[in-house]
C-alpha cells in the first residue's frame, strides 16, 4: 500500500516505508514572511532596532516549526531586529493564548509576534485584547503586529481584513 506523507516530514531510517512527501519549504515560508516584514519596516521609515519580536513556535521538532523558526532567526540576525523570546505554542490556540499572556507580562517593548500557525495567532490575539492592547499594523500607535502561517481557517482571512493579522505566510 503506497503511503504518502502530507505537510509534515518524518525522520525514519527506512525511507521505503513511504512513497513520497508533499509539503512546503517551511524555511522559505519564514524567509518570505520576514522579507515582507523588512519591506514594511522600510516603508514606514522605522529603525530595525525598534522591532521587538516574540516567536510563538509550533510543536518543537515538527518540520514546520524547525523551518519557520530558522527563517525568523536568520532574518532577525541579518536585519538587527530584537528577537526577545522563542517559546512553544504547540500549534494550539489555548497554548498560544497562555504563552502570549506571559510574553506581554515579561516584555513591555514587544511589538511583533510571529506565530507559526493560525491557531497560535488566534490565541495571541485573544491575549492581546484581554490585556487591553490592540493587534494591528500601526506599531507607532502601540499596536502589536501579529504574523501567522497557513491561512487555512476562515477566521484567519477575516482577521487580515480586520487588521488583527498583518501577514499570513
Kindly label every feature range from the protein language model.
Residues 1-169:
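A residue-level marker of the well-folded mature domains of exported/periplasmic proteins
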Amino acid at each position: 500500500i503506497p503511503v504518502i506523507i502530507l505537510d509534515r516530514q518524518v525522520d525514519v531510517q527506512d525511507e521505503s516505508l513511504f512513497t513520497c512527501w508533499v509539503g512546503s519549504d517551511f524555511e522559505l515560508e519564514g524567509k518570505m514572511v520576514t522579507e515582507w516584514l523588512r519591506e514594511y519596516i522600510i516603508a514606514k521609515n522605522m529603525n530595525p532596532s525598534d522591532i521587538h519580536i516574540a516567536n510563538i513556535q509550533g510543536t518543537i521538532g515538527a518540520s514546520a516549526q524547525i523551518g519557520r523558526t530558522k527563517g525568523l532567526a536568520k532574518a532577525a540576525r541579518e536585519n538587527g531586529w530584537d528577537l526577545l523570546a522563542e517559546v512553544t505554542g504547540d500549534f494550539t490556540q489555548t497554548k498560544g493564548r497562555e504563552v502570549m499572556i506571559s510574553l506581554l507580562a515579561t516584555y513591555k517593548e514587544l511589538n511583533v509576534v510571529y506565530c507559526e500557525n493560525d491557531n497560535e495567532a488566534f490565541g495571541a490575539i485573544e491575549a492581546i485584547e484581554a490585556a487591553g492592547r490592540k493587534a494591528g499594523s500601526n506599531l507607532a500607535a502601540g499596536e502589536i503586529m501579529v504574523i501567522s502561517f497557513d491561512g487555512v481557517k476562515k477566521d484567519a482571512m477575516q482577521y487580515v481584513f480586520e487588521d488583527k493579522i498583518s501577514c499570513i505566510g
